[in-house]
């Protein structure tokens, strides 16, 4: 029940600041499950007082078609912002296509979510984020990565199991944050998305402390 979730958050002095995850929004005939999940995300925004939803798209379509479907999703979302997250193994693999889709949708509530791991695994340099695009970035997620990626066929496995804490890998998390700041991004949320079996295996308390300490170091660098 809603009140039970709110009670848990209150007990631990926590706040939900981002809602996810809408997928398969480009399908002509969306399944009942996806329609329900979408409505649940809208409800979660209302419940937690969150203004944006993180969305991904695994299926690969043209910019024009994807933009039209994003426009329809944005219309259904109404007052909520739809944050499209480019991921290298997805149908929106990089900033270039993400920006083209968001721009072509023509929706004020269509925006981007940028993640360090997805950025570096798409082999993008830290100098391509323009002030124009920056205005359309709703939130960022920071972490780090190994120098060498997993093979392309299993790259998603690395994303879901083997990311690194900010500043502890080979990909210059501070450089990513500096790019974000220099471009003029004003993120609603700075998420720390360290999806790591090894770090979580240390225990919740240890994982939280380790991630927090390394994130703090990175943010102080910039």
Annotate each predicted stretch with a short phrase:
Residues 8-18, 24-112, 203-207, 214:
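Active-site acidic/histidine proton-transfer and metal-coordination neighborhood
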Residues 189-206:
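A short, acidic, flexible beta-alpha connecting loop/helix-capping segment that sits on the rim
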Residues 56, 143, 193:
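Conserved residues at the C-terminal ends of beta-strands
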């Amino acid at each position: 029940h809603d009140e039970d979730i709110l009670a848990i958050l209150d007990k631990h002095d926590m706040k939900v600041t981002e809602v996810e995850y809408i997928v398969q929004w480009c399908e002509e005939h969306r399944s009942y499950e996806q329609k329900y999940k979408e409505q649940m995300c809208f409800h979660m925004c209302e419940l937690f007082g969150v203004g944006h939803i993180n969305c991904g798209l695994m299926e690969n379509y043209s910019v024009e078609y994807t933009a039209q479907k994003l426009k329809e999703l944005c219309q259904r979302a109404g007052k909520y912002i739809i944050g499209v997250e480019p991921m290298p193994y997805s149908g929106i693999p990089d900033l270039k296509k993400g920006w083209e889709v968001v721009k072509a949708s023509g929706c004020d509530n269509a925006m981007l979510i940028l993640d360090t791991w997805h950025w570096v695994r798409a082999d993008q340099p830290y100098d391509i984020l323009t002030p124009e695009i920056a205005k359309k970035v709703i939130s960022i997620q920071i972490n780090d990565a190994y120098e060498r990626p997993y093979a392309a066929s299993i790259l998603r496995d690395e994303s879901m199991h083997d990311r690194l804490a900010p500043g502890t890998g080979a990909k210059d998390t501070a450089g990513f944050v500096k790019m974000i700041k220099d471009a003029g991004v004003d993120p609603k949320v700075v998420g720390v998305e360290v999806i790591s079996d090894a770090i979580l295996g240390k225990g919740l308390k240890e994982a939280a402390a380790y991630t927090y300490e390394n994130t703090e170091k990175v943010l102080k660098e910039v």
